[in-house]
Amino acid sequence: MTPDYAELHCLSNFSFQRGASSARELFERAARLGYRALAITDECTLAGIVRAWQAARETGLALIVGSEMPIEGGPKLVLLAEDLAGYQALCRLITVARRRAEKGRYRLLREDFDTPLAGLLAIWLAEPQASDSEGAWLRQRFADRLWLGIELHRGADDAARLRQLQALAARLQIPALACGDVHMHARGRRALQDCMTAIRQHLPVAEAGAWLFPNGERHLRRREELAELYPQELLDETLRVAARCHFELDQLKYQYPHELVPAGHDASSWLRHRVEEGLRWRWPDGASTKVRTQVEHELQLITELKYESYFLTVHDIVSWARKQHILCQGRGSAANSTVCFALGITELNPDNSGSRLLFERFLSRERNEPPDIDVDFEHERREEVIQYVFRRYGRQRAALTAVASTYHGAGALRDVAKALGLPPDQVGALADCCGRWSDHMPDAERLREAGFDPDSPSLHRILTLAGELIGFPRHLSQHPGGFVISEHPLQTLVPVENASMAERTVIQWDKDDLDLVGLLKVDILALGMLSALRRCFALIERYRGTRWTLASLPQEDAATYAMISRADTVGVFQIESRAQMAMLPRLRPKTFYDLVIQVAIVRPGPIQGDMVHPYLRRRNDEEPVEYPSDELRPVFARTLGVPLFQEQVMELAMVAADYSPGEADELRRSMAAWKRHGGLEPHRQRLTSRMLEKGYTAEFTARIFRQIEGFGSYGFPESHAASFALLTYASCWLKCHEPAAYACALVNSWPMGFYSPDQVLQDARRHGIEVRPADVRHSAWDCSLEPSDGEQPAIRLGLRLLRGFREEDALRIEATRQAAPFTDVDDLCRRATLDARARECLADAGALRGLAGNRYRARWAVAGVEPQLPLFAGHSSREEPVALPRPTVGEDLLTDYATFGTTLGPHPLALLRERLRAKRCRSSHELCTVEHGRPVSVAGLVIGRQRPQTASGVIFVTLEDEFGMVNVVVWHDLAERQRRVLLQSRLLRIDGHLESADGVRHVIAGRLTDLSPLLTGLDVKSRDFH
């Protein structure tokens, strides 16, 4: 008879570089083998336990929550949670061990077991030579909650090991049980487990020796095999332990912070009070009946679901940021909420945004999950907000969420190739065969191009193991700003560990796992554009005396939309990429809602769902606007009958298939997960059958489902697009009407966006803005505005652009200059106490031009600056001027780019124009006269390479010359053939043909040629987005 069995010692792949199987694989196999329960006992972590709980529910197999916990200098234990108290004790132990060590490590000490550990069961993984005193120490702490685990893996000493451990258990009167020390679900993962061990030990597999297991027995074995190895009583004891463990994650009771509610109020009344204040602020003349009705509906639902404290918490964070003059704006599904707008969390007025925002997208009675509010803050000041949260709630009750960083193709190939002994140069070359975020192994053609033999057995082994590793968690990193805040210490819910950054702590659960256990998350995110907008408003106020805010900018400005329709959008928010620029002259936005669509339409969802071209044809009157039924007209009217947003898919399901709001939100979540888990399949039958019953055609229902699958790739929420469109419009209005201030603010806020400071400044110059060089007599650390003869001020370059120059030196220069102007280089260096490095940096960058002349003279001047000794204090050390040659234009150009990454002299391509013309290369200006389909040759500096997820391997390259930019399309096969030229060239020649339609011009590449040697040392870098 086959014995029953529960595995009580099993590692998943969240024991990083140890466990060689996912929780899903482990539970599916354990269920097939007829196990009664499975304990997931990852090493000093519960990082994977939520996913294990999910897998347990899907397979119907009981999960036991536990952890493998070696004590420093002491016994090795497996601890299992018997009940809620035991789970909380386990969380506390893991937290203590992790917090006293650096990130990624832990130290569990004997003293940690001096406090009561009620509800925690312990399995002692003793060796046969273990001392009786060790067992007595454990027995004292765990009493009848202690077992001795016996693990047999068909070693030559199994019989002796079993006999000795049973004798030890008998002497100490500790019950013994069977354990598997499981590291993989099936024997076939042994090679991967060996490889992971080598990766963990930083050794090749061939040298890992004793670190490797001697066989593949550490997998989930058939119960018949276990019966051959273990006495029946050891197997039966596993069932008794499993029966005692009845803790489940749904027993966790999460409570929101309550201290924000003043005396005399409860959370509900105080939230209502705050909302009423917000309504008076947002609608000084009184809110409409429609708004009042919506607010009442939302407040009733918030109160019913007991989320009042959540909204008050987010409101508190946003209010504090506004008081510190930190620009912020909520985005995502929160923009569907009128309550969030009234509280100042979001800036999108749901009453007049033009969008049909769906509150159920944000909060639903049928969804047993908290809402998720994302708030963007200025990227340079977000840390202030994060530290405020830590101060407000304390580190015991606030922590960032984790992100499980997983293996992609390149990383998996790199680690596996290194572990299997490939030489370092070949490791890098092989990893480069994969795209940065690709989850696929390179094909044979790519491998041959890189010099590898695709038929090599050793290479096949590397590719196979790397393919198995893809998707495995590699380590825990911190979420950029996802906070979990609790009424009680977080370690009663989940273990907390140190982050890599100082002054931060992180819970062990991934951000995507929080919804399943009902934890509140507030996303405190960073957005560079908010920093740029705040700086731009400040520059305008300082220069013109005009105070603008996001809310006060003139709306629906014709000049702004005309600029957008020309695709004159370098540096603006969201519509600055080459793909967006190509779409702008075709869509030609004229209203705010057009911008909402523009933000959303160049996304994988609409593109893969084949929605872009039908929308454009209908917008341009090239095909009629049709609706599948009158009842769907209100759903699709604003997008001309074409579904573009997630909310429309939800509305369609509710109208055409009688989905409840909760079912519709379930559909939305399934869309996001369908590629990973096939989550849309349950909806295929439900949706199509209900639509057919209501009279829709089979063709229409099939087409709708294809579009829904397209949204699964990246369907953009309308609320998200509308929130972003607010910033898009603001950035465009400022670029149109205050281009100098806007360009200045962008450069001061860099790094951000698609374009480097050089490209932003060159664009400003093309728009007639005077840009003045960095000069110690006038420059601050930041770029600034100065009066000019034109309508727009001039931009004075700041010292922040000088490579290697320190901010503290710039601040001293500013402070001493305010006292009195500098008379010469010696005066500057002496009063501002500049060291040799700072002096040389200023001279090389030309920032001493006003005090010393050209670069050569400035270098001579700073070389002669010496500290003044007291003995010679009264002696003049001035030397007679030395005759030095002037730098050539080419030398100045090279030094400009080397020292501050841009030039105010001629563009590099202007100096090369005659040589390029001799090579029959046209300029960007000359392309304007070339007819569609004609062959052309162009050359330019490579300033950007983009490979969108939806482009089927196509790479979009942006070239820049002295007149502007050239958009280049490189098809997949050419990109593969000339990969090195494509990715490494700084000056690139394209031979191909011109495509021109609807005001959009592209060069379709046929051949690529690297002309970089013509630049002779010029330091120009591309901004690449793969």
Swiss-Prot record:
- Pfam families attached here? DNA_pol3_alpha, DNA_pol3_finger, HHH_6, PHP, tRNA_anti-codon
Gene Ontology biological process terms, A to Z: DNA repair; DNA replication
The answer to whether keyword DNA damage applies is yes
Which catalytic reaction applies to this protein? DNA(n) + a 2'-deoxyribonucleoside 5'-triphosphate = DNA(n+1) + diphosphate
Q: What class of enzyme is it?
A: transferase
Carries keyword NADP?
A: no
- Where does this protein reside within or beyond the cell? Cytoplasm
Any GO MF annotation of the entry: nucleic acid binding
Q: Which CDD domains does the record match to this protein?
A: DnaE_OBF, PHP_PolIIIA_DnaE2
Q: Which UniProt keywords apply?
A: Cytoplasm, DNA damage, DNA repair, DNA replication, DNA-directed DNA polymerase, Nucleotidyltransferase, Transferase
Please give the GO cellular component terms listed in this UniProt entry: cytoplasm
What EC number is given for this enzyme? Answer: 2.7.7.7
The entry assigns this protein to a family as follows: Belongs to the DNA polymerase type-C family. DnaE2 subfamily.
**Role according to the record:** DNA polymerase involved in damage-induced mutagenesis and translesion synthesis (TLS). It is not the major replicative DNA polymerase.
Name recorded for this polypeptide:
Error-prone DNA polymerase
Species of origin: Ectopseudomonas mendocina (strain ymp)
